[in-house]
Amino acid sequence: MTNGQSPAGLRGEHMRDRVITRKEEALYLAATTREPLASVAVVLADTGMRPEESFRLRWESITWVNGRYGVLFVTRGKTAAARRPIPMTSRVRAVLESRWHAASKPAEGWVWPAPTRSGHIEPSSIRKQHEAALAATPVTPFVTYSFRRTFLTRLAESGADPWTLARVAGHSSTAVSSRYVHPSDDALQNAIERLGGHKIGHSEDEQEEAARQLLLTE
């Protein structure tokens, strides 16, 4: 036991915090050929939604006309910030539109209906498919929540400001969002290089020009 947590609990927490590389994501998605995980995984990877938020997604909460590829709305949450619009990427639209057409274009209802008490998929609905996808690839195991942390980390690395990050994540404050960001080594290196590109201080040419101007004024 460590700080009141079992080793298994700590391992689960570590997997939850893990940021998935783009190569790992590609391998995993290629291995997820069965529904509902095939479409759920894409939505999680490209929206940063909490898994339970995606499970509760309804057709009436999706619009195909707003934004570049459409927008989906999270209509339930513990806070007002959790209820938010999320722009769709092209591949999110592709998988959701495919399901919509396959379901005869319903105006309402669960996107992923299931024979559960809630009427929609639950963690148990995709657990075996998730485990099978991991087993079929060399990817280090992770939990589906890792997609959220990965999405938010990538969004931060792309230059999104803290307020945008919090809004997309559904966080009530930027302080909460900061806990989800784990810059990669490459991102840190790129940030330092960008900083160097701003030429903080003065280059030798700039210093020589300044000295020349000073002599002219004397």
Model-derived features with residue positions:
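Conserved tyrosine-mediated DNA breakage-rejoining catalytic core shared by Y-recombinases
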Residues: 2-9, 18, 22-27, 47, ...
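C-terminal secondary-structure termini that scaffold catalytic or DNA-interacting sites
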Residues: 4-7, 16-19, 114-118, 193-218
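Residue-level marker of regulatory loop/turn positions in helix-turn-helix DNA-binding domains and
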Residues: 17-21, 32-33, 43, 122, ...
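Catalytic-site neighborhood detector that most strongly recognizes the C-terminal catalytic loop/helix
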Residues: 19, 76-81, 162, 169-194
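Short, leucine-enriched amphipathic alpha-helices that occur as contiguous helical runs
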Residues: 25, 36-38, 123, 127, ...
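Active-site/catalytic core of tyrosine-dependent DNA strand-transfer enzymes
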Residues: 22-23, 89-140
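Phosphate-coordinating loops and pocket residues in cytosolic domains that bind phosphorylated ligands
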Residues: 30, 56, 64, 182, ...
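C-terminal catalytic core of tyrosine-transesterase DNA break-rejoin enzymes
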Residues: 39-42, 46-53, 146-172, 179
